[in-house]
């Protein structure tokens, strides 16, 4: 089956959905600020001290999910933020299937992907009640592993990403075009 493959954050969504979702939830539920020390420990532990994995850092960042109904909040978030999807991304008007593969959690981006008509969503499997990741963070080579497992019958015509370095492995799956997104603008690599 022929498809175009898209990263999500800063590719089809003009922004970083994880941090924007957190800010959205913080405005609605100010008490989640109590998770900030744990979130900071995760960020510093990974990015500064290199003592914890990216996966664990992400779990600590999303620890605030324990205090909210994350799936309900995700629905509300996309009611407000759907206009930040890039105008050129319109799966229902494509001549081939649309696959989104993202490091963002499934629960967080599924509402907008469903609304827009994405045919297949492959993303980080995170428990929306705990913030714990089931399996691996869907990033870099893990994206290729997941695509081969969950989209084995797909052939990817064009691949779109904002980051040709971290998404280098999925760019290699393109049979026609590799497209770099910067500031919402597309350019062929």
Please tell me what each predicted stretch does.
Residues 1-3, 73, 77-189:
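C-terminal cap/substrate-recognition subdomain and adjoining C-terminal extension
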Residues 14-18, 54, 140:
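Generic structural signal for well-ordered secondary structure
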Residues 1-49:
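Active-site neighborhood of HAD-like aspartate-dependent phosphohydrolases
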Residues 27, 46, 50-51, 67, ...:
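A structural signal for alpha-helix termini and helix-coil/disorder junctions
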Residues 20-23, 27, 63, 115, ...:
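Alpha-helix termini
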Residues 36-63, 113-121:
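Short, compositionally biased "basic patch" segments
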Residues 53-87:
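Metal-dependent phosphoesterase signature
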């Amino acid at each position: 089956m022929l498809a175009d493959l898209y990263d999500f954050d800063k590719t089809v969504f003009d922004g970083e959905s994880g941090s924007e979702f957190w800010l959205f939830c913080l405005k609605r539920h100010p008490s989640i600020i109590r998770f900030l020390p744990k979130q900071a420990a995760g960020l510093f532990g990974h990015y500064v001290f290199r003592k914890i994995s990216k996966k664990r850092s992400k779990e600590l960042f999303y620890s605030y999910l324990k205090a909210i109904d994350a799936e309900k909040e995700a629905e509300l978030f996309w009611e407000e933020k759907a206009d930040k999807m890039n105008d050129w991304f319109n799966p229902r008007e494509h001549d081939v299937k649309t696959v989104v593969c993202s490091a963002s959690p499934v629960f967080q981006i599924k509402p907008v992907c469903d609304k827009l008509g994405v045919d297949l969503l492959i993303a980080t499997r995170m428990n929306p009640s705990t913030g714990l990741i089931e399996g691996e963070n869907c990033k870099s080579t893990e994206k290729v592993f997941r695509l081969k497992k969950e989209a084995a019958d797909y052939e990817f015509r064009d691949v779109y990403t904002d980051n040709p370095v971290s998404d280098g492995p999925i760019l290699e799956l393109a049979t026609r075009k590799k497209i770099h997104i910067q500031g919402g603008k597309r350019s062929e690599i």
